[in-house]
């Protein structure tokens, strides 16, 4: 979820340093390993612990206070609603899934025309201290018409309106049929399924 990036530097580096020192002293003093081996074992141990915690264990320690003050939990199934400038205001509703961990966030969904994926997602703090989900996506159009394209990309920026319900609203834009001046943009809303 790139939550790691939202941590204040003092906390981020303080926790890493304290855990590294404890692990190093464990190998050096308790197990009696030489200094270089203790350093090597410490690096390996910290890497493994960070991976396990960042991918799996963080969910069990992520309390509501952290969701409100640090970063919301974006994991789950969502309903996306877009209102596009295409053909005078096309409205589309589609399901999507967000998978997030401490270090990354990915999205995938099925639209009325095909599939959409997003591997570049980032959670940022806006100027007003609210949370925003910013991402780039690609869409594979399984049934393109003669005036459409089979693949296009886009970007979106959504503001978390309410952390408890995880409702988000924002804007999107695409390069869909840009060669013909028909690229699209509009409003997007995401609502988390309960």
Curated annotation (Swiss-Prot):
Residue spans crossing the bilayer: 15-35, 43-63
Annotated region (Required for cell toxicity), positions in chain: 1-73
Keywords on record: Antiviral defense, Cell inner membrane, Cell membrane, Membrane, Nucleotide-binding, Transmembrane, Transmembrane helix
Protein's UniProt keywords contain Cell membrane: yes
GO terms of biological process kind: defense response to virus
NAD as UniProt keyword: no
Top-rank lineage group of the source organism: Bacteria
GO cellular component: plasma membrane
Record function comment: Effector protein of a CBASS antivirus system. CBASS (cyclic oligonucleotide-based antiphage signaling system) provides immunity against bacteriophages. The CD-NTase protein (CdnB) synthesizes cyclic nucleotides in response to infection; these serve as specific second messenger signals. The signals activate a diverse range of effectors, leading to bacterial cell death and thus abortive phage infection. Causes cell death in response to 3',3'-cGAMP upon coexpression in E.coli with V.cholerae DncV; inactivating DncV prevents cell death. Protects E.coli against phage infection. When the CBASS operon (cdnB-cap15) is introduced in E.coli MG1655 there is about 100-fold protection against phage T2 and about 10-fold protection against phage T5 and T6.
Family note: Belongs to the CBASS Cap15 membrane effector family.
Free-text comment about domains: Cell toxicity relies on the transmembrane domain; its replacement by a SUMO domain prevents cell death in cells also expressing DncV from V.cholerae. The C-terminus forms a minimal, eight-stranded beta barrel that probably oligomerizes.
Subunit structure: The beta barrel domain oligomerizes; in the presence of cyclic nucleotides (probably 3',3'-cGAMP, but the cognate CD-NTase makes at least 4 other cyclic nucleotides) higher-level oligomers are detected.
Entry protein name: CD-NTase-associated protein 15
């Amino acid at each position: 979820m790139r939550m790691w990036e939202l941590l204040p530097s003092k906390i981020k580096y303080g926790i890493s340093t304290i855990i590294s020192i404890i692990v190093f002293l464990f190998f050096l003093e308790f197990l009696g390993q030489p200094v270089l081996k203790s350093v090597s074992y410490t690096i390996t141990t910290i890497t493994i612990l960070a991976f396990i915690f960042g991918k799996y264990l963080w969910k069990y320690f992520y309390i509501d206070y952290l969701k409100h003050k640090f970063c919301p939990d974006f994991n789950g199934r969502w309903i996306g609603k877009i209102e596009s400038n295409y053909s005078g205001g096309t409205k589309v509703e589609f399901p999507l899934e967000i998978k997030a961990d401490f270090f990354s966030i990915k999205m995938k969904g099925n639209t009325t025309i095909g599939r959409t994926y997003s591997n570049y997602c980032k959670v940022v703090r806006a100027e007003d201290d609210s949370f925003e989900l910013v991402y780039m996506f690609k869409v594979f159009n399984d049934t393109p018409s003669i005036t459409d394209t089979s693949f296009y990309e886009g970007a979106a920026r959504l503001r978390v309106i309410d952390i408890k319900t995880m409702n988000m609203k924002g804007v999107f834009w695409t390069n869909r049929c840009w060669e013909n001046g028909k690229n699209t943009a509009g409003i997007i809303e995401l609502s988390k399924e309960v």
